[in-house]
Amino acid sequence: MHAPVQQRFGGHGMHASGEHRGAAQVGRPVAPMLAASAPEVSQALAGACSVERKLDGIRVQGHKHGDLVAVFSRGLDDITAQVPEVAESLAALPVRSAVLDGEAIALRDDGRPEPFQGTGARAASSKDPATLRRQTPLSTFWFDVLLADDVVLLDEPLTARREVLSRIVPTKM
């Protein structure tokens, strides 16, 4: 269990409403949903599908309840202290509570991503986060919402989750 995070969020996490009580709770990271490949392109495109750009950064899961925020890595480690700008972007969202899935990426001045090695080193570094932030600032790209204002969205179709996401996340963060 992530005791320090649970203590920040009141001991047991915020219980979400809905059928998946316990599956998505603020303060308790959940394993990320990962893309899967199909044996043939025709099979992948047979039903409804979504095509997106691959953002090669640090996979992050953001948790917010009121003024409290936590950022978790793909491995479910609490990396809030290492990525303060991600935590700030999460805190600024106009929702009471949320669990979001996204990528944190270092961008060049022209808007193109830095090589992954530079971005990936941010979460793993033991250097001072303020120094790292000045050297390699991160931009946050939230691409999915698992919970918003205490409503669990895990069973909702991607189109519905994206609608909620568009209401709570500005297009540029």
Question: Model-predicted segments: where are they?
Answer:
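Catalytic cores of nucleic-acid ligases and guanylyltransferases
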Residues: M1-M173
